[in-house]
């Protein structure tokens, strides 16, 4: 992508489309580097991408697609140093961000963009889901993406995750049952990882509805699939599935089996508080709390 854009820019340095896509490609590379914990490379990518996005904006003020790049920069340049203070020295020499402005820009790109509307909607959904913890807004965007691309497994799974976050367990069951069925049918994109996630959340739906015995087979299946899929150590799904299995055993009065499960969890990487919960339930058995929905 960058090479293609460079070739176009050699012919016309003011090619707005080439500038936009080059800046976007570098920006996406920076985001990938950040998620791989290569913070220096991520900061450097942001430093290189911003002038390109600003240049495209100055050449075409009406182009809402450009707001994808400026919006992402403004949001993450403001939020990341606060979430990860050790990154601050790496970004001393790049412009400060503005979280609220970033959200506003991404919203405009999502609603008015010609080429970048889907990407802007996706990143805005992730921002609301992971950083802002505004699950209702994330759910609305996930539903929008799934409605437009009903066979896209990523958007389908995010819809389910957002429903989990707003405690709509009836809808959670419906969404993840559909995902599991598509995975069983071998539908394109619905790989084993989709089936694993579906099993976990179907188990959670049973747990939340006070049906631990029905939940157990789902957690067993999730754990079994993790043993096939987790080539580089236990995943979050493995840790949480084993924790839930222990909790079900406690409900069933099988304390020795429950203790064995919690000890397994403590041997795995902590995920979403799994270690703290396992430690707590080793000291005192888990007791079922049924919440009305």
Language-model-derived ranges and their functions:
Residues 3-6, 50-54, 104, 110-111, ...:
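Amphipathic alpha-helical segments of tetratricopeptide repeats
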Residues 18, 66, 119-120, 155, ...:
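TPR alpha-solenoid repeat register
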Residues 21, 28, 69, 123, ...:
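"A position-specific structural signal for the A-helix of alpha-solenoid helical repeats
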Residues 26, 33, 74, 127-129, ...:
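Residue at a conserved register position within TPR or TPR-like alpha-solenoid repeats
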Residues 1-16, 21-64, 69-111, 115, ...:
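Short coil/linker segments at helix-helix boundaries
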Residues 3, 44, 51, 97, ...:
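Primarily a tetratricopeptide repeat
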């Amino acid at each position: 992508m960058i090479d293609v854009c460079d070739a176009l820019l050699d012919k016309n340095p003011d090619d707005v489309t080439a500038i936009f896509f080059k800046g976007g490609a570098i920006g996406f590379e920076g985001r990938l580097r950040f998620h791989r914990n290569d913070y220096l490379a991520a900061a450097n990518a942001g430093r290189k991408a911003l002038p390109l996005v600003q240049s495209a904006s100055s050449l075409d003020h009406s182009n809402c697609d450009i707001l994808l790049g400026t919006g992402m920069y403004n949001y993450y340049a403001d939020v990341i140093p606060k979430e990860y203070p050790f990154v601050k020295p790496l970004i001393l020499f790049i412009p400060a961000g503005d979280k609220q402005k970033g959200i506003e820009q991404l919203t405009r790109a999502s609603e008015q963009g010609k080429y970048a509307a889907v990407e802007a909607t996706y990143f805005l959904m992730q921002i609301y889901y992971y950083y802002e913890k505004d699950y209702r807004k994330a759910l609305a965007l996930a539903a929008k993406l799934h409605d437009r691309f009903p066979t896209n497994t990523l958007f389908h799974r995010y819809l389910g995750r957002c429903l989990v976050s707003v405690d709509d367990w009836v809808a959670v069951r419906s969404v993840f049952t559909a995902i599991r069925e598509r995975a069983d049918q071998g539908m394109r994109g619905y790989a084993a990882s989709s089936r694993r996630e579906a099993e976990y959340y179907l188990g959670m739906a049973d747990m939340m509805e006070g049906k631990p015995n029905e939940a157990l087979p789902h957690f067993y299946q999730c754990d079994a699939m993790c043993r096939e899929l987790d080539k580089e150590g236990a995943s979050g799904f493995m840790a949480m599935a084993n924790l839930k299995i222990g909790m079900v055993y406690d409900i069933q009065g099988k304390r020795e089996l429950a203790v064995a499960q919690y000890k397994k969890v403590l041997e795995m990487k902590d995920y979403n508080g799994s270690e703290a919960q396992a430690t707590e339930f080793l000291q005192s058995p888990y007791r079922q709390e049924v919440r009305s929905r």
